[in-house]
Amino acid sequence: MKLKVILNLLKPCILHTIEEIIDYMDVCMHAEVRSVLNAETSPVSALRLHSTLGRDIRNKFSLWNHNNVACRKFHKENNELYHPDSVSQYIINELVKRIRMQNGLDVKPFELTQIYQTTGNYVAIA
């Protein structure tokens, strides 16, 4: 299934916590994207979503801005170096958990690390 425009990218949305971003996404997400997150949990799906939904999340919520308040809080709380890819992947994982729980399904978040461990390669993802 090819995903179309996922978020309205014309207006960036600045929120102050990652939880606010997840809540916003949960409310505003298209039904098509919700069904994909509900159904697919393979590493290949994770990579595809990272390149589509993840990109849109990074752009919509200005995650590439290193002064982004939500990202700075997230990385400080998790003792991680800042990278927009890790924040968008965390958001996708949390959305998968939330949507699958709402539908009474097993909670199995996407894990890009599975792809890296399987192939032994690190892939540059924009």
Where are these regions (language model features)?
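Short intrinsically disordered terminal tails
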Residues: 1, 123-126
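N-terminal export/targeting and maturation segments
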Residues: 1-37
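Compact alpha-helical subdomains of small soluble proteins
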Residues: 33-36, 40-124
